[in-house]
Amino acid sequence: MSYDYHQNWGRDGGPRSSGGGYGGGPAGGHGGNRGSGGGGGGGGGGRGGRGRHPGHLKGREIGMWYAKKQGQKNKEAERQERAVVHMDERREEQIVQLLNSVQAKNDKESEAQISWFAPEDHGYGTEVSTKNTPCSENKLDIQEKKLINQEKKMFRIRNRSYIDRDSEYLLQENEPDGTLDQKLLEDLQKKKNDLRYIEMQHFREKLPSYGMQKELVNLIDNHQVTVISGETGCGKTTQVTQFILDNYIERGKGSACRIVCTQPRRISAISVAERVAAERAESCGSGNSTGYQIRLQSRLPRKQGSILYCTTGIILQWLQSDPYLSSVSHIVLDEIHERNLQSDVLMTVVKDLLNFRSDLKVILMSATLNAEKFSEYFGNCPMIHIPGFTFPVVEYLLEDVIEKIRYVPEQKEHRSQFKRGFMQGHVNRQEKEEKEAIYKERWPDYVRELRRRYSASTVDVIEMMEDDKVDLNLIVALIRYIVLEEEDGAILVFLPGWDNISTLHDLLMSQVMFKSDKFLIIPLHSLMPTVNQTQVFKRTPPGVRKIVIATNIAETSITIDDVVYVIDGGKIKETHFDTQNNISTMSAEWVSKANAKQRKGRAGRVQPGHCYHLYNGLRASLLDDYQLPEILRTPLEELCLQIKILRLGGIAYFLSRLMDPPSNEAVLLSIRHLMELNALDKQEELTPLGVHLARLPVEPHIGKMILFGALFCCLDPVLTIAASLSFKDPFVIPLGKEKIADARRKELAKDTRSDHLTVVNAFEGWEEARRRGFRYEKDYCWEYFLSSNTLQMLHNMKGQFAEHLLGAGFVSSRNPKDPESNINSDNEKIIKAVICAGLYPKVAKIRLNLGKKRKMVKVYTKTDGLVAVHPKSVNVEQTDFHYNWLIYHLKMRTSSIYLYDCTEVSPYCLLFFGGDISIQKDNDQETIAVDEWIVFQSPARIAHLVKELRKELDILLQEKIESPHPVDWNDTKSRDCAVLSAIIDLIKTQEKATPRNFPPRFQDGYYS
């Protein structure tokens, strides 16, 4: 219930609701609640006494009667469980005085204020009604002036003089320089006498691409866009850029050449740049010809006559500062067949850019299978193919493997052949359904064909096996066969995820054979400690066989030279976004033909190899050519903001021009979410908040959390949380030590009931250990199962975020630990409130279920009903919560719907940083609700005070976003300081103050 007041605030003179004024009644009164749901035990008529159903009901009606009665019980239980929002008399009087003091100022301003949290009621397009109002022309003039002022503010925000550190290299001029041209030519000629260069030249000459150098250079010179396709190992990534640069230098035009080559992964950008530098007998970066730039890390080449390898995101960042990429002569988009979201967007941007940069050369490099599609997208531009350089690889399908090793599964019962088939997980795609129908239709004919070519026992096993599961026992049997019957060589096993990798590792280690020092078994996954994974690149001593168990990271991101045998499990973990239910899903999908080809190629790098595909021939014939492009299976909010900050036009229009446009439903859902976040106005233009969020290199909700961390002066811990959510948390899980790792994580959690604060505690403990020296840092990471590399990355990201905030004016120092930005960093509840401000409306309700044996907690969301906290969370076994609400970062459906990264939050967190507030009465219970479903008990006068204080917060936050500057906490008489202090005080003192539980401290040789 809203209230338009014209009187002073006070305990007896406050706004009155339909239920009366503020005069009497205790702040948390419950009188009469229990009576409302009692009585009526036999009120159903007939023989319904003692809670039994009426006698005239039959069959389904009886069930419905009991269901209705249970629903009433649940509703009443929920009423009784509601937390009470209260404040003591002293704070109530202080807030009344505060609201009175700002009343006069607010009366002079328009009442059409913008709420960050309830854009349905207020927005940038809100109009003040002028009908039947005296002096309406004057009001219209005022509104026009406000709109003009708004445009001026937007101009200032957009054009604030701040250049991201990652963009500095691009903005260096690239003018032709005759003196430099001559020097570059002389340096290249000298290199040809350098023994290191000569040695590398011998290697380069063996690559298939080297023999096509003239043809490639001529094609690029004579066309604005060229598509180059080639197999793995042909040399296209390392050689084409060098061909272009050397051609320019030899023609005396070296200073005019500045090549930028994009890579889909950080590791690729670094490794390729270092390889090219080595081939040119140079060190990487240091002002030489070749360098790299990835987020927060770079070794930059010289300004002109150079090659820069960078991640795709770096170029998208550059476009904010220079939309024409005016200093770049050649842009090479590599690995475009992977179809990640950023590369798809960049292709469309570059396609538009060609209309303004006739001098820009664009080279698209892809695997062979779909080069034609890219050529068509760029107006049928010319294509050229470079043959691969791999040894022959013998391929086997599932039926071949079973016949070869005579495998018999443990389970003898006949399987349900078509239980799920192509419809893995919950991915509801029409193509998958169609392929499932085809598979089912063709299966009988395929079995008859198998019986003509394979033994009866093999066909029986094929029919017996579960088609939708990876048979790990089969993989163990196949590895044993290779070890005992085949020649030496490393074995690479592809599995979809951590659970499969862990289980296979355990199965192997349970056998005496694999426990010996004749085997080196290496799991390869992002959750594994990096130090263990470095062994994967080292060749083993004679007599030792290496077995690598990996996800699809080993398809393209890394090369293991000594692999001879590849076991393709046939599955890949893929994330999709269900627009109808607004939920991400992750499931094990069948690999595509492109995946299978990449996996096969891993076996033939240094000698002839073998590839075992663990799916049958019918399945192989129906595999998709490629994985679904990322743009079609991911939320689009961050991309929508990028489109607007780059001024690429209307969101839906731009996205419709991509090679594979996302669905209208996905686009509209993302736009709606951004409007709810108040990042876009009703005309789909960026709001001041939207501009700031678009410039932060994170997802919008995390960006909002960062801004609130600055405004509420708890910057350092909030930046740690933001970095972790946008990159990954620093925890690792060594195989066999999962339970110990979980215990250590809960130890770091202390009593916070927060995954987010657990990461903060881990990070702060690492910082303290690092200050003491390398040995202490190493011991700390070892004891708490932390990755020092990830922690260092989080540290670097925090510095980048602070740079953004300084450039935008939100803080006065680029140091995340600046005391002025961390006044409230030692209070857990303020940090939780800021987490809530960023992640809302990702809220779940906790309900305690008192079972006969032990307490249990059930968790519900508004849209999904019953969900589960992810097993990795510190809250997974928690039953003693202070409050009934969790805020979470990610909701994903796998085997169940899981909440990832969750934190317990208090009522005041949700009231001040949640959605729209309403004041209601539920029977005899006075309530205050957030978005109508998060309901608390509250006396009416307290509810009105909270609602009015929230309005003041919304006004203040909007002013801070439009004109960013740090809060002056010393100016206690200012409105900003008074409003924020009052809210902080309420959050800090609800129930009882909760001091931060700090990370383990090093004492007497131990962390405690």
UniProtKB/Swiss-Prot annotation:
Q: Where is this region: Necessary for interaction with single-stranded DNA at the 3'-end of the G4-DNA structure?
A: 265-317, 498-557, 638-697, 849-860, 870-900
Residue positions of motif DEAH box: 334-337
Give the enzyme's EC designation: 3.6.4.12, 3.6.4.13
In the record, Phosphoserine modifications are located at 161, 963
Q: Which UniProt keywords apply?
A: Acetylation, Activator, Antiviral defense, ATP-binding, Cell projection, Chromosome, Coiled coil, Cytoplasm, Developmental protein, Differentiation, DNA-binding, Helicase, Hydrolase, Immunity, Innate immunity, Magnesium, Metal-binding, Mitochondrion, Nucleotide-binding, Nucleus, Phosphoprotein, Repeat, Repressor, RNA-binding, Telomere, Transcription, Transcription regulation, Translation regulation, Transport
Residue ranges occupied by any Helicase C-terminal domain in the UniProt entry: 477-647
What one GO molecular function would you report for this record?
ATP hydrolysis activity
Summarizing the annotation, the consequence of altering residue 54 to G is:
Reduces G4-RNA binding
- Kindly give the SUPFAM superfamilies that the UniProt entry links to this protein: P-loop containing nucleoside triphosphate hydrolases
Binding locations of Mg(2+): 335, 337
Cofactor dependence is on:
Mg(2+)
Where is the segment annotated DSM (DHX36-specific motif)?
Answer: 53-75
Q: Does the keyword Aminoacyl-tRNA synthetase apply?
A: no
Q: What is known of its domains?
A: The DHX36-specific motif (DSM) form folds into a DNA-binding-induced alpha-helix that together with the oligonucleotide and oligosaccharide-binding-fold-like (OB-fold-like) subdomain, selectively bind to Myc-promoter G4-DNA-containing structure in an ATP-dependent manner. Upon G4-DNA-binding, DHX36 pulls on DSM in the 3'-direction, inducing rearrangement of the RecA-like 1 and 2 and the degenerate-winged-helix (WH) regions; these rearrangements are propbably responsible for the ATP-independent repetitive G4-DNA unfolding activity, one residue at a time.
Spell out the protein name for this chain: ATP-dependent DNA/RNA helicase DHX36
> Which organism is the protein's source?
Homo sapiens (Human)
Q: Lineage, please?
A: Eukaryota, Metazoa, Chordata, Craniata, Vertebrata
Protein's gene: DHX36
